[in-house]
Each structure stands twice: as C-alpha cells, then as structure tokens.
C-alpha cells in the first residue's frame, strides 16, 4: 500500500503506539500519524496539547532511520459526526489507502468507505494503555514509566505532565 493512517489521541504517546507505527511502516510506503482530538487539552482524558503530543511523537520516532521520509504527523480536531469522519480526514490529509487501528469503530468507518482497515497485534495491551498511564500519573503511582520511550518519559516529566494530571484530578 502507498499510505496508511495510524489514528490516536496519543495521551501520551507510548510504546504500544510505537509498535503500531512500526507495524504500519512494514505494510505501507508512508504512514500518516493522525493526532486526534487536537483541540482538546488540560482535561483528565486529554491532558496534553496537540503541540506537546506532536513533539513527544517526534522524540519517539527519531529512533527510526527513515522516519522523516516515510512519516508525517498531522493534528486533526474532532468532529461529532462519525458517518462523515473518514471524508473529513480525506479533506484534511494527503490521499491514503486505509487505516491501522485497534478501535472497532475506526475500523468499521474505514471499511464502510471501501478502504483498508488493518488491526495491528496488540503490545502489552493491559499494561501500556494511555488510560492506565494517565491514571497512574494522576494518582502519583509508579509503573507508567516503563510504557514510555525514554525520550518521551523525559519530556513528559519536563512539561510536568504527572503534576498536571494530579492537579486536574483534584479539580474534579
């Protein structure tokens, strides 16, 4: 395939995301990493800004030899209409052949548009999920560190993401 999308919120980007992106690169000439919910930030579900997520992804992807040539990162704001979401992506992004996702709804929407919908093998699914990482950070517990690329781990500490999540949790 020429070009595949990897869609996610990347809150924060973790090793499961890296595994999925590498898997997609094994199946396409190019991959567009779509940073979804780009308009969201400073909430428990979406604590990082789109710019912070793009920067963290770049730090993580720099380990790949040809990442600049084969990867693009595109922040995309949400729309509240699933039926037209793939068309919305077609309007915002260069042409693509399909998506790589573990999300059933995303796969269904792409299949319904006649596009490839590929499910990657899961990587430490229960352990390295954004939800678990954010929950551990918000509660001040350890265990999230091993799910992040070392560069991303340093970056989220530098921007104070664990403290941001604790403060957001207190505001609830």
Swiss-Prot record:
Gene3D superfamilies cross-referenced by the UniProt entry:
HUPs (3.40.50.620)
Q: Coiled-coil region(s) at which residues?
A: none
What is the first-listed, main subcellular location in coarse terms? cytoplasm
Q: What is its EC number?
A: 2.7.7.1
Annotated GO molecular function terms are: ATP binding; nicotinamide-nucleotide adenylyltransferase activity
Pathway of action: Cofactor biosynthesis; NAD(+) biosynthesis; NAD(+) from nicotinamide D-ribonucleotide: step 1/1
- GO annotations under biological process? NAD biosynthetic process
What family does this belong to?
Belongs to the archaeal NMN adenylyltransferase family.
Q: Which PANTHER family match?
A: BIFUNCTIONAL NMN ADENYLYLTRANSFERASE_NUDIX HYDROLASE, PHOSPHOPANTETHEINE ADENYLYLTRANSFERASE
- Indicate what this protein is called per its UniProt record: Nicotinamide-nucleotide adenylyltransferase
């Amino acid at each position: 395939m020429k070009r595949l999308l990897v869609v996610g919120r990347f809150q924060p980007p973790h090793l499961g995301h890296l595994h999925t992106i590498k898997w997609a690169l094994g199946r396409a000439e190019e991959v567009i990493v779509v940073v979804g919910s780009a308009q969201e930030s400073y909430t428990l579900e979406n604590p990082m800004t789109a710019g912070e997520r793009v920067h963290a992804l770049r730090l993580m992807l720099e380990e790949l030899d040809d990442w600049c040539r084969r990867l693009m990162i595109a922040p995309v704001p949400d729309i509240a209409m699933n039926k037209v979401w793939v068309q919305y992506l077609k309007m915002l992004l260069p042409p693509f052949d399909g998506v790589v996702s573990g999300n059933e709804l995303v796969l269904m929407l792409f299949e319904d548009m006649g596009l490839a919908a590929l499910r990657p093998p899961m990587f430490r699914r229960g352990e390295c999920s954004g939800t678990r990482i954010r929950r551990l950070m918000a509660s001040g517990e350890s265990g999230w560190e091993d799910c992040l690329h070392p560069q991303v781990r340093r970056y989220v500490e530098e921007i104070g993401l664990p403290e941001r999540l604790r403060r957001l949790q207190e505001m609830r």
